[in-house]
């Protein structure tokens, strides 16, 4: 086992060995390659698999983890144990959500199916020192179900961008109640640096989870110059969408209780009332962004091809003819299911609530919504760079 442990550590930090192993098309091929690399002819497949499984359960020492920087993607954070999990990337993400991209990484790379290295959270700082400091091109905040997935998907079609759409590892660090604000800020910066280093030549766009807006001040302190877009929508339509498919923050998930008081024990008389409370808190935090980051607000009904191109320009992303064509094609697809053509659903959403429920939502949230909607002519600044190649 000691010899295999050292060989395992060497593999984690060797670009050449990883490239060789990534050529394997099956577990049998990979085990054969590992047997050659590790001079492990005396070990059967079962013995190798058992040894790898045991090593996956151990923390990679911090001094070894440093060598993983620029090769491996930190993808998950285990809050209880404060452990970071890593995998090998598979090209730039274009999926609607980052967890779908991670699924692709595991499905298409046999090595990811066998090797599941984990490190301490503290190892991130040393790892990040091995890669360049990343300055994100832009942040996307949203109230959920506001078109942010469409926007991030369109931007992911640009050759200059890499989009992290609701990255699980970023949000889990932010919601860890055991970490102080300065620790969260430092670890988020380390994670963005490490993730960005895997996609050289591309600028980072982060679409945050809806509840991450409660950490807007922390994120602005870390990245004071990053442009921010904030997406909003008619609250009746937002809540109707959650009625059909409930998001984490609308489900009463106790893991979010430390993020904001509204996620704690609810005294609401109904599920709808609780969700109105949550959306109200999100909208108030969205309004408070004005004092934190000077965002550009955009309503769902103002999101179209031209506004996407203007946001790309605001983020400093060039968009040539091919990029514009890919964006136009993406705009025609369902944001969350790109294989399905988009069908407007405003009428269906309007029919979810009865008149009394719709009135309760409107009375409570309409004024907040109207205050967030920019005039159409000021929805997104017009920047010539959006159309430059």
PLM region descriptions:
Residues 1-68:
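Terminal, compositionally biased segments used for targeting/anchoring and flexible tails
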Residues 13-15, 147, 234:
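Short loop-to-helix capping motifs
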Residues 54-190:
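PAPS-dependent sulfotransferase catalytic core
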Residues 140-144, 165-167, 206-212, 231-233, ...:
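Short His-Asn-centered micro-motif
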Residues 184-200, 210-213, 240-310:
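PAPS-dependent sulfotransferase catalytic domain
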Residues 219-244:
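Conserved phosphate-donor/acceptor-positioning beta-strand/loop module used by diverse small-molecule
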Residues 288-357:
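The conserved 3'-phosphoadenosine-5'-phosphosulfate
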